[in-house]
Amino acid sequence: KIIAKEPCIVAGLEVATAVFRTVDENLVVTAHCQNGDLLANKQMILEVSGSARSILKAERVTLNFLGRMCGIATLTRKYVDQLAGTKAQLLDTRKTTPGLRILEKSATVVGGARNHRFGLSDGVIIKENHIRAAGGITIAVERLSESLPPTIKIEVEVSNLQEAQEALDAGAELIMLDNMSLAEMEMAVRTIRGRALLEASGNVTLENVRQVAETGVDFISTGAIIHSSRWADLSLLFEV
């Protein structure tokens, strides 16, 4: 059986099952909880019966996936809990482990966040380097507007109120407030409210995410829920 050795949010049950069944299709895997459940210390996650050799072969890979995904879901839930009572929604980012993006981003959803882009094809964000290469926010938005289907929204990353106003005037439907102070974010919300969606990003921590949400932004994105999460402490124990 696999047990939690500390309180955590469960994520990755289907991945764990797939690992065991890939190693040996005759293994019987029984989950004792559901993704998203909060487990107590020493609570059982799943039970596996069958060949001891097969179970041991799959043990480390299974625990690696589960530990990583449970850790992400657990930290994400802590962030989401801080947003209770505000309208802000938590978003993940593309700062993921190479090869594991789908699994890591699925774990943030289990924890209560929403997925931002999986890749560049999922949406358009005009960032600092794009703006410099194009020669300015307005021209960057205009060029994209000419080539994009009308169903795709354009988001622009800005670092101050002047840039936020320019992005709005250029036609951006989403504006990312990057590394702006709480006071600047509050001013941006008052100025832009209802005319574009606002996303706060940069230096978001568990300690300040509530304050960021209270500025009135629509979304808060942070890579920390993935890249700074700690693996959940899990263990596989044999019973004969």
What are these regions (language model features)?
Residues A224-V240:
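Short, charged, intrinsically disordered terminal tails
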Residues K1-A170, L174, E186-T191, R195-E199, ...:
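Acidic/glycine-rich phosphate/pyrophosphate-binding loops and surrounding catalytic core
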Residues L177-D178, L198-V204, T222-A224:
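Glycine-rich beta-strand-to-loop/alpha-helix junction loops that act as flexible
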